[in-house]
Swiss-Prot record:
Active site: C101
Protein's recorded name: tRNA-dihydrouridine(20/20a) synthase
GO molecular function: flavin adenine dinucleotide binding; FMN binding; tRNA binding; tRNA-dihydrouridine20 synthase activity; tRNA-dihydrouridine20a synthase activity
Similarity comment: Belongs to the Dus family. DusA subfamily.
Keyword vocabulary terms for this entry: Flavoprotein, FMN, NADP, Oxidoreductase, RNA-binding, tRNA processing, tRNA-binding
Signal peptide: none
Superkingdom in the source lineage: Bacteria
Function: Catalyzes the synthesis of 5,6-dihydrouridine (D), a modified base found in the D-loop of most tRNAs, via the reduction of the C5-C6 double bond in target uridines. Specifically modifies U20 and U20a in tRNAs.
EC numbers for this chain: 1.3.1.-, 1.3.1.91
Organism: Xanthomonas axonopodis pv. citri (strain 306)
InterPro entries: Aldolase_TIM, DUS-like_FMN-bd, DUS_fam, DusA, tRNA_hU_synthase_CS
Cofactor: FMN
Reactions catalysed according to its record: 5,6-dihydrouridine(20) in tRNA + NADP(+) = uridine(20) in tRNA + NADPH + H(+); 5,6-dihydrouridine(20) in tRNA + NAD(+) = uridine(20) in tRNA + NADH + H(+); 5,6-dihydrouridine(20a) in tRNA + NADP(+) = uridine(20a) in tRNA + NADPH + H(+); 5,6-dihydrouridine(20a) in tRNA + NAD(+) = uridine(20a) in tRNA + NADH + H(+)
Residues under site feature: Interacts with tRNA: N98, K184, R187, R298, R301
Length: 334
């Protein structure tokens, strides 16, 4: 096993969910600084976009982001296979198929969560991607759609995609309601059923199972790891990113670093992007939650939110934002 594959294998325990409009390359670099051992995921990119679009913009990444997975959307096996081959050329560590997004636009394109009703098609897609690349092909899914209330149906879906070659499943442990709820509501309203994911792992001990959904703190995340191979943080990693750092530190028996130190570690990357003509707001929007719940946290967000969009804004604005925080919040909490 090479160092890169060993690092990829070790990253199974903690990952950051693919989140549209959030987990872009700038966010992922920041998350890598917070969580050196975590597995990172891109935003979902449709297979057609990978094949025909501006790849540098859509799937380009900084080498520091490894281990990194590309999440693909789509339901055409041939197109997904072609996109998977491109992903291998670009150096990704994993390809993940989205079978969990419930948005109307995604449904209209016949991909995302609605694919849970077509397990044979998903299996065909997985098999095609496996034939096109040596990278591990994984699937992110829900427990079911709409009123599905049948563990056996969920388990059969998983068994079909695993038989086709899926190396791992990420289970968002709630149903997707395809009508009547927004994507945001679909992350909150359908009840969580962690026990289904636990049972899946118990009955299939050789299958890597990663649990996603409603994980917002270190202690519950560690408790979930008694029943699953990994945990995937979603909104918590974005709105309160220090939780991501603390969980990565706990899992790897490393001391937690002060928030200010983590932010300053981001400075060289930010300044390199500024030098290329990118606006400050593209980087700082991902750090707004770093002082969540801390003295001065609201003022920190306000300074960055109001100033980062201005022409010529630079790192000095981040320094101004830091000055608004209470320095006591920078200490390491025992």
């Amino acid at each position: 096993m090479t160092a890169s594959t060993d690092r990829y294998a070790a990253s199974l325990r903690l990952s950051v969910a693919p989140m549209m409009d959030w987990t872009d390359r700038h966010c992922r670099v920041f998350h890598r600084l917070l969580a050196p051992s975590a597995r990172l995921y891109t935003e979902m990119v449709h297979a057609n976009a990978v094949i025909h679009g501006d790849r540098a913009r859509l799937i380009g990444f900084d080498p520091v982001e490894h281990p990194l997975a590309l999440q693909l959307g789509g339901s055409d096996p041939a197109l997904l296979a072609q996109a998977a081959a491109i992903a291998q050329e670009w150096g990704f560590d994993e390809i993940n198929l989205n079978c969990g997004c419930p948005s109307d636009r995604v449904q209209a394109g016949r991909f995302g969560a609605c694919l849970m009703r077509e397990p044979a098609l998903v299996a065909e897609c997985v098999a095609a991607m496996c034939a096109a690349t040596h990278l591990p092909i994984t699937v992110k899914c829900r427990l079911g759609v709409d009123d599905d209330d049948d563990y056996a149906l969920f388990a059969r879906f998983v068994d079909q995609v695993v038989a086709a070659g899926a190396a791992m499943v990420v289970v968002h442990a709630r149903n997707a309601w395809l009508k009547g709820l927004s994507p945001k509501e679909n992350r909150e309203v359908p009840p969580l059923r962690y026990d289904w994911a636990y049972r899946l792992k118990q009955e299939r001990p050789g299958l890597p199972v990663v649990l996603n959904g409603g994980i917002v703190a270190v202690e519950p995340a560690i408790a979930h790891l008694q029943h699953a191979d990994g945990v995937m943080l979603g909104r918590a990693a974005y709105h309160d990113p220090y939780v991501l750092h603390c969980l990565d530190a706990a899992l790897n028996q490393r001391p937690e670093q002060p928030r200010e130190s983590l932010l300053r570690a981001y400075q060289p990357y930010v300044e390199s992007q500024l030098a290329q003509g990118l606006g400050l707001k593209h980087m700082t929007r991902h750090v707004l939650g770093l002082f969540h719940g801390q003295p001065g946290g609201r003022a920190f967000r306000q300074v960055l939110s109001e100033g980062a969009h201005r022409p010529g804004a630079g790192w000095e604005l981040v320094e101004q934002a830091l000055e608004r925080t209470d320095t006591r919040s920078w200490r390491v909490v025992a």
